[in-house]
Amino acid sequence: MQIFVKTLTGKTITLEVEPSDTIENVKAKIQDKEGIPPDQQRLIFAGKQLEDGRTLSDYNIQKESTLHLVLRLRGGAKKRKKKSYTTPKKNKHKRKKVKLAVLKYYKVDENGKISRLRRECPSEECGAGVFMASHFDRHYCGKCCLTYCFNKPEDK
């Protein structure tokens, strides 16, 4: 029977084969006509790559069927070298977890009266519960950047 082999260049060659012929035999016939070594040939039929040990009848290749010839690609992707950094990686700042942190902001005296130790930010943007940091010369809100400066250090 006669089959067609279409190469990458678009050229179509005809081969005389039998249904019992193996794929290896077909590749050898292509080598005789085109000069491409069988180890570099890949034959595709109906979207499947044909394996060397099987026959044409295994793949249901009938007379006047067209096989597509593509060349086997050499190698794979280039191996990349792992980067080595000269300086060590900077550690991220870890926030310290303080148990019962609310106790820093309030004081309970012997009468049971609660007084604030830190000033609460009056800005509408911050809302209730945002306290200002007390520095030696000012009170500062870290959320809205509001700052109150003292005239004298003993004026706290």
UniProtKB/Swiss-Prot annotation:
**Site positions (Essential for function):** H68
- The Ubiquitin-like domain extends over 1-76
The protein's site described by Interacts with activating enzyme is found at R54, R72
Lineage of the native species? Eukaryota, Metazoa, Chordata, Craniata, Vertebrata
Give the family per the record.
In the N-terminal section; belongs to the ubiquitin family.
Regions that span the bilayer: none
Gene name of the record: RPS27A
- Keyword Metal-binding attached: yes
Q: Name one GO biological process term.
A: translation
Give a yes or no for keyword Ribonucleoprotein in this entry. yes
Source organism's superkingdom? Eukaryota
Which Gene3D superfamilies does the protein's record reference?
A: 6.20.50.150, Phosphatidylinositol 3-kinase Catalytic Subunit, Chain A, domain 1 (3.10.20.90)
- C4-type zinc finger segments: 121-144
Q: Per UniProt, which keywords does this protein have?
A: Cytoplasm, Isopeptide bond, Metal-binding, Nucleus, Ribonucleoprotein, Ribosomal protein, Ubl conjugation, Zinc, Zinc-finger
Task: Extract the CDD domains matched here.
Answer: Ubl_ubiquitin
- Give Gene Ontology CC terms: cytoplasm; nucleolus; nucleoplasm; nucleus; ribosome; small-subunit processome
Q: What is this protein called?
A: Ubiquitin-ribosomal protein eS31 fusion protein
InterPro entries in the record, alphabetically?
Answer: Ribosomal_eS31 (IPR002906), Ribosomal_eS31_euk-type_sf (IPR038582), Ribosomal_zn-bd (IPR011332), Ubiquitin-like_dom (IPR000626), Ubiquitin-like_domsf (IPR029071), Ubiquitin_CS (IPR019954), Ubiquitin_dom (IPR019956), Ubiquitin_ubiquitin-like (IPR050158)
**Residue numbers spanned by region Disordered:** 76-95
Cite the location of the cross-link Glycyl lysine isopeptide (Lys-Gly) (interchain with G-Cter in ubiquitin) from the record. K6, K11, K27, K29, K33, K48, K63
What SUPFAM superfamilies does this protein map onto?
A: Ubiquitin-like, Zn-binding ribosomal proteins
Please tell me what else the database record remarks about this protein: Ubiquitin is encoded by 4 different genes. Uba52 and Rps27a genes code for a single copy of ubiquitin fused to the ribosomal proteins eL40 and eS31, respectively. UBB and UBC genes code for a polyubiquitin precursor with exact head to tail repeats, the number of repeats differ between species and strains.
